[in-house]
Amino acid sequence: TTEIYTLSLHDALPICQSRHKADGARRDEEYREYIAGIPGPKIVVVQDLDKPATTGSFWGEVNANIHRALGCVGTITDGAVRDVDEMTNAGLKALARRLCVGHAHVVPVNWGCEVQVFGQHVEPGQLIHADKHGFLAIPPGEEKGLLDAAVFMDENECNTVIKTARGASGLTRTELLKQLNQSVTDFGEAARNKFGSPGEFGD
């Protein structure tokens, strides 16, 4: 499994105005110690406290390589990322609000805490599904049975609606609509039998 660890940070600009500058180096060390002390693989979820003024990025070539060395596989941030090609080469995946050209003076403020990114509250250790489309934070307590449900629904789609749609060649309009309607009914009945609800095509 992949554990989720959270971080909030400032990327204050100009550098001289960063209220965390004096102890920034020690904060970085403590943050790395925190990440290093947790078994991987890990995803770091970062709340940028300066947004929408994301003048700099915590994530770039250097931090991507550091975090890969610390057992991290990706990050989700409502701030910015940079050095996208270099991050890819490091093997660190990322979902971010935007790109930027510099790192400014980015300082970790809190870690191991609840954060809010893209309107979603995320707690340390919370299960997350993430891909190129975005991410979902799974509510605590809902993890059990999730894999079984996902596999079932995928197979249900493939055996009903998708199967019918892919086999539509040569059917008349009337035949196609009849088969589609039946496949939707079959999908709903299978979902209802499994979960007590007809799913996405239900009432």
Task: Place the predicted regions along the sequence by residue.
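A hydrophobic, small-residue-rich beta->alpha segment in the mid-to-C-terminal subdomain
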Residues: 127-170
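A short acidic, glycine/proline-enriched capping/turn motif at secondary-structure boundaries
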Residues: 16-19, 50-53, 81-83
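Extracellular/luminal Protease-associated
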Residues: 34-77
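A short secondary-structure junction signal
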Residues: 56-59, 78-79, 87-89, 106-107, ...
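Short, small-residue-biased leader/transition segments that mark boundaries at the very start
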Residues: 1-6, 11-13
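A contiguous pocket-lining binding segment that forms or flanks enzyme active sites
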Residues: 77-78, 84-135
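Glycine- and charge-enriched low-complexity intrinsically disordered segments
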Residues: 159-200
